[in-house]
Amino acid sequence: DTVNDATAFLETFFKLYPTATEKELAYYVSGNVLEPIGRDYLYSELINPIFTKDGENVKVKVAVKFLDNQTKATQVSQYELVLHKDSNWKIIG
């Protein structure tokens, strides 16, 4: 189902996102919607994702918990994203 699919996509994406290059991000993100983080963060979990169907797209509000490998501190970042699925999911906004 859409929510499970989108959740799995986001988990995969946020595992890669902290260390991804712009070229790698291009597979998951349309244009420059998200800038590379370029930090040694380790994905921990999605916190309370809220999905809203918006025509062909799915909007998601989510907090993402990362572990900073340098400081061992927990970092929580808020995201509001628009997802679209053709053959694969992509973050378009």
Task: Describe each region flagged by the PLM.
Residues 1, 78-93:
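Short beta-strand edge/turn micro-motifs at domain boundaries
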Residues 1-40:
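Core segments of small alpha/beta cavity-forming domains
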Residues 6, 31, 36-38, 48-49, ...:
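Residue-identity detector for glycine
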Residues 42-80, 84-85:
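Surface-exposed, charged secondary-structure patches
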